[in-house]
Regions:
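Non-heme Fe(II) oxygenase catalytic core, chiefly the N-lobe of the double-stranded beta-helix
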Residues: 1-244, 250-285
Length: 285
């Protein structure tokens, strides 16, 4: 196994192994590397959906098995119209976010792989919230230490203008994450359960800092997100077919980037469930 650090505060490219056939010794070494670098990029793995799920399951229980992140419908039609709910779902991911902070249980991580890649390679970006916390000025660090904010997919999609158009017979939405539970409350600074290091927990789903005027909260979170997601704390991966990655959702935010939606794109996303002891929202315990 060869590990080459990326040109960022985190991340590494890993070669010289097959994700489909890891022995226990290699797996133990790989997990330690993952905790150190938070994002591991595996070029040209060409894993199947079943192999991806099996690899992800080594990290822990799955929140859900491999799901397509795509603009290709079940009939094979490419969805590209701006008011199409498929397009809205894809475009919403262009904001920086942690996965499942809007659910009671924040995800531990995710495995992502590329099956169909459009021209321009539709990069995915990641941002290091541990390095962001470490480089906060003293005044801002003191402020955020005691703050908590709510997280909601309704909030983030509505603010971006990407709420689904279609509702079910009950008047709700069938897409994942649009639940009727109380929005999840999370501290802006979370200590990583395995490394013991503090990380910012912010992103597009966060809003309504407790005890702060809503407009002031929105401005503060926008400024914090903008500042946090800057070099050298960011990395954008330009996809090639067959690439796979795994990232630590407790440390990293991520985002999609715009691409020509008239071109097909199909990625596979397997989400790793968080530990209830550390990733359960404050108000869902």
């Amino acid at each position: 196994m060869d590990v080459e650090p990326l040109d960022a505060s985190f991340g590494a490219t890993v070669t010289g192994l097959s994700l489909a056939s890891l022995d226990d010794a290699t797996w133990s070494e790989l997990y330690a590397v993952w905790l150190e670098y938070a994002l591991l990029v595996f070029p040209g793995q060409f894993i199947t959906v079943d192999e991806q799920n099996a690899f992800a399951a080594r990290f822990g229980e799955l929140e859900f098995k491999a799901a397509p992140i795509t603009n290709i419908g079940r009939s094979g039609r490419v969805h590209f119209e701006p008011d199409d709910d498929v397009v809205k779902s894809v475009r919403g991911n262009e904001g920086w976010h942690h996965d499942s902070t809007y659910m009671p249980l924040q995800a531990k991580g995710a495995v992502f792989s590329a099956e169909i890649v459009p021209e321009g390679r539709a990069p995915t970006g990641w941002a290091d919230m541990r390095a962001a916390y470490d480089t906060l000025d003293d005044e801002t660090r003191r402020r955020v230490e005691g703050m908590s904010a709510y997280h909601s997919l309704f909030y983030s999609q509505d603010r971006a203008g990407y709420m689904p158009s279609k509702k079910n017979e009950s008047g709700g939405y069938d897409q994942y994450g649009y639940h009727d539970m109380e929005p999840s409350l999370r501290p802006l600074v979370k200590v990583h359960s395995e490394t013991g290091r503090p990380n910012l927990c912010i992103g597009r789903h966060a809003y309504g800092i407790v005890g702060m005027d809503p407009d002031e909260s929105e401005r503060f979170l926008d400024e914090l997100n903008e500042w946090a997601c800057q070099p050298p704390r960011v990395y954008f991966h330009e996809w090639e077919i067959g690439d796979a990655v795994v990232w630590d959702n407790r440390r990293l935010m991520h985002r999609a980037t715009p691409f020509d939606m008239r071109q097909p794109r199909r990625m596979w996303h397997t989400r790793i469930a968080g530990d209830r002891q550390s990733e359960l929202a404050v108000n869902h315990r």
